[in-house]
């Protein structure tokens, strides 16, 4: 069996109470960014969901450092993908005895950090 050098670490956050469209705005913002820069940007971001994305990114960094022994200073966010999770359906009463459905969306977030070679 051939041993492959694994130079990436992943972290995931599931069932986050935000729509995938809103979460993808923040995820797309940190893609291909150095992790130190991404943490600074997420800390000062006005988006509510940036706090959850920052927690997931810190988990990926910790996985890279503790499980694989990668250098934190050379880590880059290579993937930040967003997926749809469950949809909570609620009913809102309206006029004349009618009712409308309200969909409350949930999302999944997957972050991959990779150690880049110095050129």
Swiss-Prot record:
Pfam family, one: Ribosomal_L22
Cell membrane among keywords: no
Example GO molecular function: rRNA binding
Keyword Disulfide bond assigned: no
Example of a GO cellular component annotation carried by this entry: cytosolic large ribosomal subunit
CDD domains membership: Ribosomal_L22
Keywords attached to this entry: Ribonucleoprotein, Ribosomal protein, RNA-binding, rRNA-binding
Signal peptide span: none
InterPro entries: Ribosomal_uL22, Ribosomal_uL22_bac/chlpt-type, Ribosomal_uL22_bac/org-type, Ribosomal_uL22_CS, Ribosomal_uL22_sf
GO biological process annotation, one example: translation
Assembly and oligomerization: Part of the 50S ribosomal subunit.
Record's function text: This protein binds specifically to 23S rRNA; its binding is stimulated by other ribosomal proteins, e.g. L4, L17, and L20. It is important during the early stages of 50S assembly. It makes multiple contacts with different domains of the 23S rRNA in the assembled 50S subunit and ribosome.
Family label: Belongs to the universal ribosomal protein uL22 family.
Alphabetized PANTHER family for the sequence: CHLOROPLAST 50S RIBOSOMAL PROTEIN L22-RELATED, LARGE RIBOSOMAL SUBUNIT PROTEIN UL22M
Annotated protein name in UniProt: Large ribosomal subunit protein uL22
Gene source species: Rickettsia canadensis (strain McKiel)
């Amino acid at each position: 069996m051939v041993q492959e050098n694994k130079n990436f670490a992943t972290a995931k956050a599931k069932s986050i109470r935000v729509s995938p469209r809103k979460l993808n705005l923040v995820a797309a913002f940190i893609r291909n960014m150095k992790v130190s820069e991404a943490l600074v940007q997420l800390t000062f971001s006005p988006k509510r969901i940036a706090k959850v994305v920052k927690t997931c990114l810190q988990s990926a960094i910790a996985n890279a450092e503790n499980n694989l022994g990668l250098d934190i200073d050379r880590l880059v966010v290579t993937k930040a993908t967003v997926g749809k999770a469950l949809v909570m359906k609620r009913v809102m009463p309206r006029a004349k005895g009618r009712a409308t459905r309200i969909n409350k969306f949930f999302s999944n977030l997957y972050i991959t950090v990779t150690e880049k070679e110095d050129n």
